Amino acid sequence: MRQVIVAVLAGFILAGCVQKFPGPITVKPEPINISEQEVKAKIDNFYSECSKLKDAFKCKRAADDIYKSGDFRSAAIAYDMVCYGFQYIPACKQLADMFAHGDGMPRDIDTAVTIYQIACNNGDNNSCDLARNLRVQNQNR
């Protein structure tokens, strides 16, 4: 009986270890312009919703919805909140991607590298590669 329980628990643990993070957003929407008041209202609403959810995955999905609407400024703030509030690597990577590509903000390679490095230090090997590649590209300019 003990072996069955151990086997079942091992299965649950392994299933949790191989759980995939949501993939990156692959289609970049058209950016929209919104006022500072609209950004503040959207972020206040996001913060309230995310505080109720208390779930990094669901909060990142809500930030993805903001991004997909084309409101990159609000999305960057939302990803920042999820990245640093939950230490949720997919949100950190999306924020770094936004800095690397200049989505809704001036392109900032140094900030992108810093955020990718945070994700790398938390075990995301892809972020290590992205940080290294951006450093090399930046040095060659």
Where are these regions (language model features)?
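TPR alpha-solenoid repeat register
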Residues: K58, A91, S127-D129
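Hydrophobic face of amphipathic alpha-helices that form TPR/SEL1-like repeat modules
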Residues: C59-K68, Q94-H101, N133-Q137
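Short helix-capping/linker turns of helical repeat alpha-solenoids
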Residues: K52-A56, I66, G85-Y88, H101-D103, ...
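Bacterial Sec signal peptide processing site at the extreme N-terminus
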Residues: C17-I34
